[in-house]
């Protein structure tokens, strides 16, 4: 594990790149550039290969532009990985690549920068957008959303079991005072949450749910997985690191469907051998080592899964 570009520590760096790079002269995609940790190691492994990076975050794009100037094999695009197909064609001039990498969720620099509005530990404007120039901020959403829809978002995307109680408290507070900062919201949630998990801030799940909704993270993930699989050459691999159960469930389900086909009723005279299966999963899910978790506690929930195209 290597500390790269400021304070961000890339999770399962060697494990993921070992799985990803199968051809040193191939074409690769990093769907989540961040601060370039995985990108730089991929470039180190490549000879004449090329790499295309994606990120929504303008700060990440700034780092990517610097790397573009350093290494002609690398290009960066400010967009969601869900839209990778058109950019692959535009940049590489082909529609198939040798590998796609996704390191999901919010990065350490985003969490630690109070001005971005992701943190419930440091006070800042309640924003939470990966790209602050697009879409509705968390503060704008909280000011207008119905109590029911707010509770549904925290429950579905944050798995917050006290979502209704928390949403009620937020709506009561906003009726007399605008909610504009992260600590303002965090305090309301903490006071409404009757059962704090040991070692976890009471606002963790609610903040996660709001952030995922504001950025359409799960919608982008579902589209991006499909786009990545379609973009792979035979022998090409999709490597995905997820950080919470909602993401991992989507990734696991998608890869299982691609590798095994749909679940069929037992009485049907059709078996997997009769299906046109184009992919296989590579090994079992990989989790960070104990030493990595000791060095970087944010890696503790990470899961790496890999899918490989075996035929057209």
Swiss-Prot record:
It holds the Pfam family Methyltransf_5. Specifically methylates the N4 position of cytidine in position 1402 (C1402) of 16S rRNA. HAMAP family: 16SrRNA_methyltr_H (MF_01007). One of its GO terms (molecular function) is rRNA (cytosine-N4-)-methyltransferase activity. This is Ribosomal RNA small subunit methyltransferase H. It catalyses: cytidine(1402) in 16S rRNA + S-adenosyl-L-methionine = N(4)-methylcytidine(1402) in 16S rRNA + S-adenosyl-L-homocysteine + H(+). It comes from the Bacteria. Its EC number is 2.1.1.199. S-adenosyl-L-methionine binds at residues 36-38, 55, 81, 103, 110. InterPro entries: RsmH, SAM-dep_MeTrfase_MraW_recog, SAM-dependent_MTases_sf. Keywords: Cytoplasm, Methyltransferase, rRNA processing, S-adenosyl-L-methionine, Transferase. It comes from Marinomonas sp. (strain MWYL1). GO terms for biological process: rRNA base methylation. Belongs to the methyltransferase superfamily. RsmH family. Its main location: cytoplasm. The gene is rsmH. It is found in: Cytoplasm. GO terms for cellular component: cytoplasm.
């Amino acid at each position: 594990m290597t500390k790269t570009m400021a304070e961000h520590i890339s999770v399962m760096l060697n494990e993921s790149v070992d799985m990803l790079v199968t051809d040193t002269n191939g074409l690769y995609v990093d769907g989540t550039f961040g601060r370039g940790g995985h990108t730089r190691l991929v470039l180190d492994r490549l000879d004449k290969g090329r790499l295309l990076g994606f990120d929504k975050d303008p700060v990440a794009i700034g780092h990517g532009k610097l790397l573009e100037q350093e290494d002609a094999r690398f290009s960066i695009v400010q967009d969601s990985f869900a839209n990778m197909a058109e950019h692959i064609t535009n940049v590489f001039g082909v529609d198939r690549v040798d590998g796609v990498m996704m390191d999901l969720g919010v990065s350490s620099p985003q969490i630690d920068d109070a001005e971005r509005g992701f943190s419930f530990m440091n006070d800042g404007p309640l924003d939470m957008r990966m790209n602050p120039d697009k879409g509705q901020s968390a503060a704008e959403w909280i000011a207008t959303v119905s109590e029911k829809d707010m509770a549904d978002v925290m429950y579905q995307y944050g798995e917050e079991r006290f979502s209704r109680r928390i949403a009620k408290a937020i709506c009561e507070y906003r009726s007399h005072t605008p909610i504009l900062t992260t600590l303002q919201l965090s305090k309301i949630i903490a006071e409404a949450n009757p059962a704090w998990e040991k070692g976890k801030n009471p606002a963790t799940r609610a903040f996660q749910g709001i952030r995922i909704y504001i950025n359409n993270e799960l919608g982008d993930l579902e589209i991006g997985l499909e786009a990545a699989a379609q973009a792979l050459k035979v022998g090409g691999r999709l490597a995905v690191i997820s950080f919470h159960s909602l993401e991992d469930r989507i990734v696991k389900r998608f890869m299982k469907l691609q590798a095994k086909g749909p679940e069929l009723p037992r009485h049907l005279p059709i078996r997997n051998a009769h299906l046109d299966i184009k992919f296989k999963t590579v090994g079992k899910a990989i989790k960070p080592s104990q030493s990595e978790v000791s060095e970087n506690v944010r890696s503790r929930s990470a899961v790496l899964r890999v899918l490989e195209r075996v035929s057209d």
